[in-house]
A protein has these predicted regions:
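Exposed, low-structure sequence patches enriched in small/polar residues
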Residues: 25, 48, 52-54, 74, ...
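Short alpha-helical segments and helix-capping/turn motifs at coil-helix boundaries
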Residues: 54-56, 100-105, 143-148, 189, ...
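Hydrophobic, small-residue-rich alpha-helical packing segments that form membrane-like cores
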Residues: 144-146, 154-201, 206-235, 242
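Outer-membrane beta-barrel proteins
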Residues: 17-21, 62-65, 75-79, 90-97, 107-109, 179-182, 267-280, ...
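Bacterial Sec-dependent N-terminal signal peptides
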Residues: 1-20, 68, 559
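Outer membrane beta-barrel
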Residues: 73-167, 203, 294-315
Length: 559
């Protein structure tokens, strides 16, 4: 399809603009010991693999029409394709992730009034509580719909979107096919409307007030299944709904530094494997209020959700096949020890989540700011369960606490060539709820980071971290040194020591040494690592990463 579009564009529209873009990405691991593959194929059943890798090749052809004046005229065409070579992927990905072939094909035409896309399409309605189709390669998520998408802007301030198709899950890992897509046998579809009230009220524009409202409807269709449940008087068959619909309304307001958002979603009864075949309807409420001006930013948010797991297949578990993505109100830390206990959103059982943040900057040449200024950030996040199924009440019992994160961070430029950051963090982490085993972990973490510009060509950065807890694996100490050379070469080393906590959690030494080189659009990194097991999370969705040791190599190129 891409080659056909390219030939047509060159032959028929030579006076317009045609260009090609794309990228190559390779992430590999040579483990010290060959690992047993979890992917079974007729050619290699339970093979021992000494090289694991994730590989992607993206290619896009763009046609831009130079003269597109007039209503309804074509402005451009874009064709996208992606080749995936993940026959033996990195550790921690779900079994169905393994596969190879053409992972995505799409064709999009842009007009004055909107756009039409066919093939494999992504999309998001509102904050994503009903529909959020996206790709995250770190987690192994690629949940597009194979179908079509229509965006229409009939009038300024009005935008309509319709989308539908079959959702991709993973590759068909039991067949050696180059075109081995594995997607839902049934369909999902949705419509969305955004209305900018300020576009119809000139005085709002003049006062800098932006008010918008929106609504969405998403539904899925599934064929009936023969699922049985045993009761004291015999076996019974579930009466499963074939159509499941969900609706959402929202409103947002921005005015003079203030930003407010209210969003409510409701989902009809949808018995699935994830929610224990419950016929209880689902609902979610999101409230957000923020204010910002020079030197000050304040944020307060709250979210209630109950039974809001929305999948294209009622039998699906894990990371694949999810239609929605609930906003997460917990921080995503970048420091290694602070990220040991990340939170995963509880879709089926529900939760109340609260978050508040205050950021203040003292200006230059002030008593608190010093010569270069100082920034302090205070943030707190707290997640609790629901008192009972379908309840709006917060579970205030001891077991009702799911997650707590309270931290203070100080950023200061000490001198012309020295920047420093200090952070203190307290976390409460309910392992039984979040990962399915264990008890409550209460941990305190301290971080000190320094960055020194030695010369214009040499920069040194270091991190010193300490985590203390009496539960789980015990205490951690971590040190990182990183040297940037000539703005193209980075050499780093990190060492972490875990004291352990009894026979179940023995002490351990973990380390990483690596070098990364960047030239124009090329980036190559090589290293040796021994990592502890843990979770990689983004947006409240987590992937378990087992302990691993070996040589790592990554390469990326974009044009």
């Amino acid at each position: 399809m891409v080659l056909l579009l390219c030939c047509m564009a060159m032959g028929l529209w030579a006076h317009d603009t045609v260009y090609v873009s794309g990228g190559i990405q390779h992430d590999g691991l040579f483990p010290t010991q060959p690992v047993s593959s979890y992917r079974t194929t007729p050619r290699a059943p339970w093979a021992k693999i000494d090289h694991l890798s994730n590989n992607y090749i993206d290619l896009s052809v763009h046609y831009l029409r130079m003269d597109s004046a007039g209503a309804g005229h074509l402005r451009g065409i874009q064709a996208d394709t992606r080749i995936e070579l993940n026959q033996w992927p990195l550790l921690g990905y779900e079994p169905g992730f393994a596969g190879h072939g053409i992972g995505r094909l799409s064709l999009k035409a842009d007009f004055d009034w909107g756009s039409i896309s066919v093939g494999d399409v992504y999309g998001q309605f509102g904050s994503g509580m009903l529909l959020n189709l996206y790709e995250n390669r770190d987690l192994g998520i690629d949940n597009y719909l194979r179908g079509a998408k229509l965006d229409v802007m009939p009038y300024k301030g009005i935008r309509l979107t319709a989308i539908g198709g079959k959702q991709r899950r993973y590759w068909n890992c039991y067949e050696d096919r180059a075109w081995g897509w594995n997607y839902a046998q049934d369909a999902a579809m949705g419509v969305n409307m955004e209305l900018g009230i300020h576009d119809f009220v000139p005085v709002m524009h003049q006062e800098g007030i932006h008010l918008s409202v929106g609504g969405s409807y998403v539904s899925k269709y599934e064929h009936d299944d023969t699922l049985l449940v045993y009761q004291p008087d015999g076996w019974y068959r579930y009466n499963l709904p074939r159509w499941v619909g969900a609706g959402e309304v929202r409103a947002s307001l921005q005015a003079k530094g203030w930003d407010a958002l209210v969003e409510y979603a409701y989902k009809a009864n949808d018995p699935t494997a994830e929610n224990g075949m419950s016929y209880r309807p689902g609902q979610a409420l999101l409230l957000s209020l923020s204010y910002s001006r020079k030197g000050l930013a304040v944020l307060a948010q709250a979210k209630h959700s109950d039974n809001m797991s929305f999948r294209s297949s009622r039998n699906q578990r894990g990371l694949a096949g999810r239609l929605n993505l609930l906003p997460v109100f917990t921080p995503q830390h970048t420091y290694s020890l602070a990220a040991i206990y990340p939170y995963a959103t509880q879709y089926a059982t529900g939760e109340w989540a609260f978050q508040a943040e205050l950021r203040y900057t003292w200006g230059k040449k002030t008593k608190m700011g010093g010569k270069y200024g100082t920034t302090v950030k205070l943030s707190a996040a707290h997640v609790r369960g629901l008192r009972s199924e379908g309840s709006w009440a917060v579970d205030m019992s001891a077991g009702g606490e799911y997650y707590t994160d309270v931290n203070i961070e100080l950023n200061k430029r000490v001198s012309r060539n020295w920047w420093t950051t200090a952070m203190l963090l307290y976390q409460a982490y309910n392992q039984q709820v979040i990962v399915g085993k264990g008890g409550m972990v209460r941990a305190g973490t301290a971080v000190w980071e320094n960055k020194v510009k030695i010369t214009d060509q040499f920069t040194l950065r270091n991190e010193l971290q300490y985590l203390f807890t009496r539960q789980d694996a015990g205490q951690w100490l971590s040190l990182l040194l990183e040297l940037d050379l000539w703005q193209c070469l980075t050499v780093s080393g990190e060492y972490s020591y875990n004291t352990g906590n009894g026979s179940e959690h023995p002490s351990g030494h973990y380390y990483t040494v690596a070098a990364a080189y960047t030239h124009d659009a090329h980036r190559l990194s090589i290293g040796y690592t021994k990592n502890n097991d843990g979770y990689n999370c983004a947006g409240g969705v987590c992937r378990y990463m087992p302990e691993q040791e070996g040589v790592t190599m990554s390469y990326s190129f974009n044009w």
